Swiss-Prot record:
The keyword Nucleus does not apply. It comes from Daucus carota. Pfam families: Pectinesterase. Gene3D superfamilies: Single-stranded right-handed beta-helix, Pectin lyase-like. It comes from the Eukaryota. Its EC number is 3.1.1.11. This is Pectinesterase.
Length: 319
């Protein structure tokens, strides 16, 4: 798996590499690198919080497989962290790539916000990664991001933030939340209509984990709710199981943002994809024009034609 990329350094929990922790390898990496710096993370469970700061550019985390290389921690809001600082892994330096790794926050549903992965890295991409937590699993904080063949699981607002991000060919599963909670797949945070940000889920599969499936009637699950006034989310060309409530989307607080948000659905399939029972908000629409849908593809929305090829990850630019 990792033979196609030659690592600069190797991290191994068992001491057989250059470093025993991922954090040590990141600290030793060059600053402002113009070329890719590959940190191979051998199979193992790495219990640490890892920060890839702004100066650490073009870093790649290369794991041995999503079931074998696991970075895990449990910081959370209930125990005194902020949502922002709770992330098990935070990637900010531009050009960050990760492949064949699990990012996990094990705080659990009762601990409120607890982020597995926060990304503020421009032109960042993730391939064959698992992102596992409960509330606020994946913080797509800012800049242009791409996720391909990833598995994302969580409960409340589990993909959230204000990046321009496309999740393509991903499996996105709601899991059993805490008592009385509703699941929200997304909570997009656009604060101004001029921002070119949004969450796009394309050619993906939205469903439920095995712990939610038998009880999904007790825990309503929605495609998203508007965290900020101009929240923008598009779900297109994806299969949606009956885990998603027929209304599709849920308010944040009364009428807040319902006229100013942009929520679109385009050519989805599956038991949860029917749009006849959807919300009637001014900001919600079933997209019928392929031209409009094209604007949310990786080629248009995140300028994928200029950078995705260099990631070496698979992708498709269009519809």
């Amino acid at each position: 798996q990792s033979s196609t990329v030659t690592p600069n350094v190797v991290v191994a929990a068992d001491g057989s590499g250059d470093y025993k922790t991922v954090s040590e390898a990141v600290a030793a990496a060059p600053e402002d690198s113009k070329t890719r710096y590959v940190i191979r993370i051998k199979a193992g469970v790495y219990r640490e919080n890892v920060d890839v700061p702004k100066k650490k550019k073009n870093i790649m985390f290369l794991g041995d497989g999503r079931t074998s290389t696991i970075i895990t921690a449990s910081k959370n809001v209930q125990d005194g962290s902020t949502t922002f600082n709770s992330a098990t892994v935070a990637a900010v330096g531009a050009g960050f790539l990760a492949r064949d790794i699990t990012f996990q926050n094990t705080a659990g549903a009762a601990k409120h916000q607890a982020v597995a992965l926060r990304v503020g890295s421009d032109l960042s991409a993730f391939y064959r990664c698992d992102i596992l937590a409960y509330q606020d699993s994946l913080y797509v904080h800012s800049n242009r991001q791409f996720f391909i063949n990833c598995f994302i699981a969580g409960t409340v607002d589990f993909i959230f933030g204000n990046a321009a991000v496309v999740l393509q060919d991903c499996d996105i599963h709601a899991r059993r939340p805490g008592s009385g909670q509703k699941n929200m797949v997304t909570a997009q945070g656009r604060t101004d209509p001029n921002q070119n940000t949004g969450i796009v889920i394309q050619k993906s599969r939205i469903g439920a984990t095995s712990d939610l499936q038998p009880v999904q009637s007790s825990f309503p699950t929605y495609l998203g709710r508007p965290w900020k006034e101009y929240s923008r989310t598009v779900v297109m060309q994806s299969s949606i199981t009956n885990v998603i409530n027929p209304a599709g989307w849920f308010p944040w607080d009364g009428n807040f943002a319902l006229d100013t948000l942009y929520y679109g659905e385009y050519q989805n399939t599956g038991a949860g994809a029917a749009t006849s029972g959807r919300v009637t908000w001014k900001g919600f629409k079933v997209i019928t024009s392929s031209t409009e849908a094209q604007g949310f593809t990786p080629g248009s929305f995140i300028a994928g034609g200029s950078w995705l090829k260099a990631t070496t990850f698979p992708f498709s630019l269009g519809l």
